[in-house]
Regions:
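Sec-dependent bacterial lipoprotein signal peptides
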Residues: 1-20
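Short, conserved secondary-structure segments in the cores of folded domains
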Residues: 50, 95-96, 107
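Short, hydrophobic beta-strand segments
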Residues: 105-113
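Hydrophobic beta-strand segments
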Residues: 78-81
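Short S/T/G/P-enriched beta-strand
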Residues: 21-74, 85-91, 113, 122-145
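Short, acidic Ser/Thr/Gly-rich low-complexity loop/linker segments typical of extracellular
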Residues: 94-102
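Short, intrinsically disordered, low-complexity terminal segments
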Residues: 17-19, 95, 118, 127
Length: 145
């Protein structure tokens, strides 16, 4: 077991660096019914269950940005956040609906089970989608043997 500790430590470091350096997920802008440019941004596309005490994300911030034809932020539009129906009982959005302020509507996504979920944000008859992976908390290095 002792000879595996450095290898496990190295693997943990690679995991930490890869998630810390992962870029934000950004959907390209699309035009809405009223000509607004709508985009979706996700802070973490990989989150972990029960990772408290570790430097691993347990939730993801989801941001919808809405701009007019001149690129100015659009305020006051309702944005509804949701997940595919099979995940409805296993995820949360806080809040589930928000209005744009300074051109942005934000929510915090969380889940209570592992897997891959497609999330959606709907604004002005446009739906933007993203995929978030939820994994179990990694086992501590050297644990169990």
């Amino acid at each position: 077991m002792v000879r595996y500790v450095p290898t496990l430590g190295f693997c943990w470091m690679l995991l930490w660096v890869s998630t810390a350096c992962a870029p934000l997920y950004n959907e390209p802008e699309v035009l809405s019914e009223h000509g607004y440019r709508v985009s979706l941004h996700v802070s973490d596309t990989l989150i972990f269950l029960g990772a408290s005490g570790l430097n691993l994300p347990q939730a993801s911030e989801v941001v919808v940005r809405v701009r007019d034809a001149q690129g100015q932020p659009v305020d006051g539009l309702p944005v509804v956040f949701s997940a595919e129906p099979s995940w409805a009982q296993n995820v949360s959005f806080t809040p589930a609906e928000a209005h744009t302020r300074n051109g942005e509507a934000r929510t915090i996504f969380g889940a209570n089970t592992t897997g891959v979920v497609h999330i959606m944000a709907r604004v002005d008859h446009v739906t933007r989608e993203a995929r978030i992976t939820i994994q179990s908390r990694p086992s501590p290095a050297g644990g169990g043997e």
